[in-house]
């Protein structure tokens, strides 16, 4: 995996200005920026094509990104909540100390450090807060929320697809558990974390491929079918929800709704450093992302059934 791209001629300047080394921009950040630029190119064109107001595209993108970052961090904190606020011998209370000390309890996950670090992002938190932020913006300016969300779907799909490539290339850890299946690219030997060299499911690439397929579907076919208003948005909720639900069966994630006994190492601190962690891991219950996926699927299906969104408009309105 390639975590960063070195820029040798900038390192001396960075060291002179900030008195520290700089290894170069992260591949994750670069691909996230490419995803943002791609979306910023497509969205105003789609708004204009639909006879909406393209001048809102910049704010929609910026608020979408801001909401994504805020929500992804908040959901990550919820995900590791029981690793932050724990009874620790020698310390008074399990809530006050983590709230008043940046690094929290010694040897434990910290609240503030994780909240403001560059890592630790939960997709569905970002997805929900991103939609919330742009919806509040559209509500404030009295825009047609359903039409604008329809217009944003292709940009959301391509942005997510490129962003997931960043997860894979940088080796940020959102991989699957070990497998003996041999499928080029979809299974790879992970060297970015412990245990090194274990063949695992390449879940970031799997999600990226699926999201690229969604983009092609919405960009080159569905948007030209004259579906009823919000059909595109509702379809995306259902399709993306199903995709995420299924991929999560291959990922290493904590089960918030367990259905069977957990793997032997799952509740041991720093278990990922044990070579047997990934090889003995298995899906043992629904994760936070899977529960949110089910809710999103149901929401999308509700709108499709309630408004009969499989039907097409009688006359073109775009």
UniProtKB/Swiss-Prot annotation:
Task: Describe which pathway this protein belongs to, using the record's wording.
Answer: Protein modification; lipoprotein biosynthesis (diacylglyceryl transfer)
A single Gene Ontology MF term assigned here is:
phosphatidylglycerol-prolipoprotein diacylglyceryl transferase activity
* Mode of membrane association: Multi-pass membrane protein
An example GO BP is:
lipoprotein biosynthetic process
Q: Which domain of life is it from?
A: Bacteria
Q: Which InterPro entries match?
A: Lgt
Q: What is the disulfide pattern of this chain?
A: none
- Under Enzyme Commission nomenclature, its number is 2.5.1.145
As recorded in Swiss-Prot or TrEMBL, the protein's gene is named: lgt
Spell out where the chain crosses the membrane: 24-44, 60-80, 115-135, 198-218, 285-305
Q: What organism is listed for this UniProt entry?
A: Leptospira interrogans serogroup Icterohaemorrhagiae serovar Lai (strain 56601)
Give a Gene Ontology cellular component term annotated to this protein: plasma membrane
UniProt: a 1,2-diacyl-sn-glycero-3-phospho-(1'-sn-glycerol) binding residues: 164
* Identification of the protein by name: Phosphatidylglycerol--prolipoprotein diacylglyceryl transferase
Q: Which UniProt keywords apply?
A: Cell inner membrane, Cell membrane, Membrane, Transferase, Transmembrane, Transmembrane helix
Q: What does this protein do?
A: Catalyzes the transfer of the diacylglyceryl group from phosphatidylglycerol to the sulfhydryl group of the N-terminal cysteine of a prolipoprotein, the first step in the formation of mature lipoproteins.
Q: Where in the cell is it found?
A: Cell inner membrane
Coiled-coil spans are none
């Amino acid at each position: 995996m390639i975590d960063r791209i070195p820029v040798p001629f900038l390192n001396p300047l960075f060291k002179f200005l900030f008195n520290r080394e700089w290894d170069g921009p992260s591949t994750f950040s670069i691909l996230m920026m490419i995803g943002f630029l791609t979306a910023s190119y497509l969205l105003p064109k789609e708004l204009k094509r639909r006879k909406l107001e393209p001048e809102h595209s910049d704010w929609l993108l910026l608020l979408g990104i801001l909401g994504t970052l805020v929500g992804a961090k908040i959901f990550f904190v919820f995900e590791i909540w029981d690793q932050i606020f724990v009874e620790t011998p020698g310390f008074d209370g399990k809530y006050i100390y983590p709230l008043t000390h940046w690094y929290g309890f010694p040897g434990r996950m910290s609240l503030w450090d994780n909240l403001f670090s560059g890592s630790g992002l939960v997709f569905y938190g970002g997805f929900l807060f991103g939609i919330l932020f742009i919806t509040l913006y559209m509500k404030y300016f009295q825009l047609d929320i359903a039409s604008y969300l329809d217009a944003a779907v292709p940009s959301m799909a391509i942005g997510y697809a490129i962003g997931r490539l960043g997860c894979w290339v940088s080796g940020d850890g959102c991989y699957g558990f070990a497998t003996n299946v041999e499928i080029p690219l979809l299974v790879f030997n992970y060297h970015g974390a412990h245990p090194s060299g274990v063949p695992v499911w390449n879940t970031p690439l799997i999600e990226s491929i699926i999201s690229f397929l969604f983009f092609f579907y919405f960009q080159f076919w569905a948007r030209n079918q004259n579906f009823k208003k919000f059909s595109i948005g509702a379809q995306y909720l259902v399709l993306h929800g199903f995709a995420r639900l299924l991929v999560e069966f291959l990922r290493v994630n904590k089960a918030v709704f367990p259905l069977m006994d957990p793997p032997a190492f799952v509740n041991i601190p720093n278990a990922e450093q044990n070579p047997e962690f990934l090889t003995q891991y298995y899906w043992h219950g629904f994760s936070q992302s899977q529960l949110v996926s089910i809710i999103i699927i149901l929401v999308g299906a509700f709108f499709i059934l309630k408004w009969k969104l499989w039907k097409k408009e009688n006359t073109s309105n775009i």
